[in-house]
Amino acid sequence: MESRGSIPVMSLQQRMRISRENAGLNQEEMAKKIGIGRATYAKTEQGVREPRRGELLAIAAITGVDSHWLATGEVPEVGEH
């Protein structure tokens, strides 16, 4: 994992996995919640497939993470959203 100063930089796939795991979901449960198959979701977490915007928004809503952070890895400034 790269770092920017003392802040580790995670890939989109790492952010997706960590968000899912912190929500207590396995890949199959997350896939069902966002309306895709488990194998498709697994390919997305592995970086073989790019997630669709709607999938990222759904993952953010389900896991409670900021959608901008999930998509970009950037923490929005206070008052930005």
Protein language model regions, located:
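Short, charged recognition helix plus adjacent turn
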Residues: M1-P8, A61, H68-H81
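Alpha-helical residues within the helix-turn-helix
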Residues: E21, K32, A61
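A short, Lys/Arg-rich alpha-helix, primarily the initiator
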Residues: M1-N22
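Conserved hydrophobic/aromatic packing and binding residues within compact polymer-binding modules
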Residues: M16, M30-A31, Y41-T44, L70
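DNA major-groove recognition helix of helix-turn-helix/homeodomain DNA-binding modules
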Residues: G35, R52-W69
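Residue-level signal for the short linker/turn that defines the boundary of a DNA-recognition helix
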Residues: Q14, G24-L25, P51-G54
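Recognition helix of helix-turn-helix/homeodomain-like DNA-binding domains
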Residues: G35-P51
